[in-house]
């Protein structure tokens, strides 16, 4: 703890943050004395709040008003005084499992559904990045004959995405049907042996020497096909962020000013390239201090002035990664006012990330 606080100061800071989160009103010593069992008088609480203000953890928005937490006060609360409501995690994961079925809907539909559920539960803006396509691993490949001389290569990745491309077999008029089918079977087995469990970036790195000589006449065609498939797997705007919960956050008093709302909307709609590195903490190092929850899931919290983007300095961003094995492939985040119930939002973000890791991130 960078700021040394005695036990009473910790209790008063904890109560002040909790009360302000609940009421959105500046907090006075009388309210804390009446509503929290601090076992000291209102006068003593007032003195302690004064000391916390001198330490930069509280401030007075107006001379006659009570006090509210500063960004530093929230940071001390989050890192040292808060107890996460971990009972939420199991309920959230069960809710996501009940409402989303990744085997019957698309990957993007799963992510959009998760974003909507998280926004509803948190009451804030939810941000979920699409998986980086080229980090996906190949689950299986298959060559399927679709016309007399045309074959489709189908590639299915571990995050339920499908890629396909057509190839010409050339003149097959004098080739027996059974031989063509056998060649396709051998080539399919070769591709699966070479590429299953490897990333899409490795599509062009096959050891063609292992392909039997009689089938190597298809090698150049397959190589070109795979390179084309790799090129098309690099989506335009691959740093896309799915956003939900705009209507929820507009109900917060911090966003009552039209200019504040317009600033946030501009960031979310037009400046995603700036926002993406902040939510994807696994790709960009920052000075923000992570906290470790009981499951050892790292959750990053950027509070107010810790945010490098000016439009977000009235906000907090809570984010975590979802993974394939130990490799991050995307991120989940909640964006709201600094006055948010961190003890609830952090487990919600963590549980959503865990669900996506379990559902979408299993190795091939």
From Swiss-Prot:
One of its GO terms (biological process) is negative regulation of DNA-templated transcription. GO terms for molecular function: DNA binding. The keyword rRNA processing does not apply. It holds the Pfam family HrcA. Keywords: Repressor, Stress response, Transcription, Transcription regulation. InterPro entries: GAF-like_dom_sf (IPR029016), HrcA (IPR002571), HrcA_C (IPR021153), WH-like_DNA-bd_sf (IPR036388), WH_DNA-bd_sf (IPR036390), WHTH_transcript_rep_HrcA_IDD (IPR023120). PANTHER family: HEAT-INDUCIBLE TRANSCRIPTION REPRESSOR HRCA. NCBIfam families: hrcA (TIGR00331). The gene is hrcA. The keyword Repressor applies. Negative regulator of class I heat shock genes (grpE-dnaK-dnaJ and groELS operons). Prevents heat-shock induction of these operons. Belongs to the HrcA family. It comes from Cyanothece sp. (strain PCC 7425 / ATCC 29141). This is Heat-inducible transcription repressor HrcA.
